[in-house]
Amino acid sequence: MKAIGFKSSFQLDEGNCFEEFNFDIPHPSGHELLVKVQSISVNPVDTKQRTMPVDKVPRVLGFDAVGVIEKIGDQVSMFQEGDVVFYSGSPNQNGSNEEYQLIEEYLVAKAPTNLKSEQAASLPLTGLTAYETLFDVFGISKEPSENKGKSLLIINGAGGVGSIATQIAKFYGLKVITTASREDTIKWSVNMGADVVLNHKKDLSQQFKDNHIEGVDYIFCTFDTDMYYEMMVNLVKPRGHIATIVAFNSQQDLNLLKSKSVTFTHEFMFSRPLHHTDDVIKHHEYLKDITEKVEQGYYQPTTTKVIDGLDVDSLYEAHQILESHSMIGKLVINLK
């Protein structure tokens, strides 16, 4: 089988260092599924991991995938051969930038039947990140009526995570405020369901006042935590909660959180599979809920760009686009 990877970390300005490798098709055992990959999504985490030291050569990146189960391990109980599934994988194994992939069943769910593979591939990583942030971190209710009156600010509402998080939060009853700046990103965020879209290039505090927003219960930062840290502390309500998926690049003063008793959390969606937590089955459960909501028409996919064919050039192009920070929604590569 073909896989696209690299032997050592590299920056894009060093040239295209992706290479094509050929491996034997693996055999599933235990709770493993052998999936023939149809479509993958490229995420910012891929571009970050490309620049990190390589422990095992070659390094094959990729998390989001949609594909067909070709074989199952002898302990698999939730799936059968021929099922079309989607997932976001685990940092503990080779990624989805390959024709066949082994994946454990508790990280997988059946893909929405009303979506093409290139549409469904946009949902797992960002959807899981949003579900974990909203339900596990913020602790919102799964009963929409119980979230009435609660508000959420999403920094970078038109990105992949912000796009699906907006839809999920709206379905579960939150008032959603997002940030964007370009005409196309503002329109996109509104289409995703945002109640208010603020211009991140202007003073957010003043825009809160202009829109009669006294503060928000939750803030979900999906872009440059350092840039927004003090502003988020100012905008969150007392005893509110801030979560980020972007690591700090410099030291920040946690004492700023004290006077409001604000909770600050780093959300890392891969913590469960990385550390084999007892509740790792939540990935399956959350993905299953995403599938149900998509099939019922409540969520829509966030794919905005599709590249046909997985090879060294298409993957390099995808990484270039991601690093330009101009993407709205998600970028997908079809293997078919």
Swiss-Prot record:
This chain's source organism reads Staphylococcus epidermidis (strain ATCC 12228 / FDA PCI 1200)
Q: Name one GO molecular function term.
A: zinc ion binding
Q: Which UniProt keywords apply?
A: Metal-binding, Oxidoreductase, Zinc
Q: What's the family?
A: Belongs to the zinc-containing alcohol dehydrogenase family. Quinone oxidoreductase subfamily.
Q: Name one Pfam family in it.
A: ADH_N
Query: What protein does this entry describe?
Result: Zinc-type alcohol dehydrogenase-like protein SE_1777
Q: Which SMART domains match?
A: PKS_ER
The reply on keyword Nucleotide-binding is no
- Kindly indicate whether the keyword Oxidoreductase belongs to this entry: yes
Q: Which cysteines are joined by disulfide bonds?
A: none
PANTHER family given in the database record: ALCOHOL DEHYDROGENASE RELATED, RETICULON-4-INTERACTING PROTEIN 1, MITOCHONDRIAL
The family database entries (Gene3D superfamilies) matched by this protein are listed as: Medium-chain alcohol dehydrogenases, catalytic domain, NAD(P)-binding Rossmann-like Domain
Alphabetical list of NCBIfam families matching this protein: adh_fam_1
